């Protein structure tokens, strides 16, 4: 998947919207979802936590099993109730996404089948970003923020 001319399906509160460069957002119905190439599924950044984790080269092969225990002390939830996804960045860093398993199950039940096979990413990581810069998207009642290559969140606007 290339970040150039990326098509994004934004999933919020059981509804999908296709966002394509140069086009108005298109609501997706459960029937007949037809998606262009180079499309990813953007999930709510207030439901998925993104962070960057340094990982020694010898730990990478066991990272899938070790990650929950590496981060356990920094999390409020029981790690057995969470799903951890990771991808290599550079220089021994891993991009990590953490979400409740129950939340994934909710999404899988409510979203049309063609969306389930798309690459999943948080909406904050779909915002443009450059080193040393923050990108903010102001929406009704909240702000989506990206502050690093693999980090971002949705926060209430009153904060």
Residue ranges and their predicted role:
Residues 1-159:
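Hydrophobic/aromatic-enriched cytosolic interaction surfaces used to assemble or bind macromolecules
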